[in-house]
């Protein structure tokens, strides 16, 4: 708390032009590279590590390069082995029982939050507050994660399986995280909820009848639009967000809700058969 925020850039593309652009914007002598991978074997992460490690070794020398890298990974992974062999500045071992898309409130999300200058104590307190009212002992009607999840699941079964997330401008980035969480958890066995993020809004009367709208409300800039959707007969939920620290509670709410929605749909929220298949195919292509 009180520490100055650092510039944080997230590289999630293997496009050579974007990788080179990211490298040019970050002078290696002043850059800390965070290598984040639960399994450690993800091809894209390994490609990024190889590129930036070799580049840093060439620029700073092998003895200094390791001080510019930190790894977040599961115990026993390839990345842990590489990090220790190369003498990374630190190796942070995450909880192996938490799946990748559910890991925003463990080390994978907490380290970037710390670098951005967030008060981690307050961040976790907000999440813990939501967790307390999401326990199985809390009556269903007062359990925010269960209520949202039940609505998502039942709406999907009723044909409203497209989930449109509406946010005020300050919360736009939340949609990218929520999109992966919902899609990767629910989309399997011919079932699923399709999240729609950053969508050009149609007039309420022209919006498809297969939609469920959820508005993450911080400033109220979309109040009028949401009222029009509701007046046109579209289900539109409003989730109030007080400030940036409330996002940790929303992360927890959406994780619980996604698991509940998947249970309603009859799919396993925590496996990822298509993801594993895609990883296998990618590795086969690279090896060919």
Go through the PLM ranges and name each one.
Residues 48-60, 225-236:
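A short, gly/pro- and small-residue-rich
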Residues 190-202, 211-248:
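Structured mid-domain segments that build the active-site/substrate or prosthetic-cofactor binding neighborhood
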């Amino acid at each position: 708390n009180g520490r100055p925020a650092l510039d944080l850039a997230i590289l999630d593309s293997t496009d050579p032009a974007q990788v080179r652009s990211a490298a040019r914007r970050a002078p290696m002598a002043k850059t800390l590279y965070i290598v984040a991978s639960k399994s450690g074997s993800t091809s894209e992460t390994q490609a990024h590590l190889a590129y930036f490690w070799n580049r840093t070794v060439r620029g700073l020398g092998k003895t200094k390069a390791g001080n510019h890298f930190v790894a977040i990974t599961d115990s026993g992974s390839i990345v842990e082995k590489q990090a220790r062999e190369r003498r990374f500045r630190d190796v942070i071992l995450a909880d192996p029982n938490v799946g990748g898309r559910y890991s925003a409130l463990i080390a994978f999300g907490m380290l970037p939050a710390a670098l951005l200058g967030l008060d981690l104590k307050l961040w976790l307190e907000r999440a813990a507050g939501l967790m307390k009212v999401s326990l199985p002992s809390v009556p269903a009607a007062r359990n925010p994660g269960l209520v949202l999840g039940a609505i998502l699941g039942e709406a999907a079964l009723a044909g409203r399986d497209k989930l449109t997330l509406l946010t005020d401008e300050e919360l736009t980035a939340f949609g990218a995280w929520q999109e992966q969480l919902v899609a990767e958890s629910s989309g399997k066995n011919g079932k699923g909820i399709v999240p729609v993020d950053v969508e050009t809004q149609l007039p309420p009367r022209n919006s498809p009848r297969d939609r469920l709208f959820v508005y993450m409300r911080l400033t109220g800039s979309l109040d009028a639009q949401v009222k029009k959707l509701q007046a046109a007969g579209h289900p539109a939920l409003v989730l109030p967000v007080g400030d940036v620290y409330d996002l940790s509670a929303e992360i927890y709410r959406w994780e619980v809700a996604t698991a509940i929605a998947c249970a309603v749909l009859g799919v396993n929220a925590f496996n990822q058969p298509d993801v594993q298949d895609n990883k296998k195919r990618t590795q086969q292509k690279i090896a060919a």
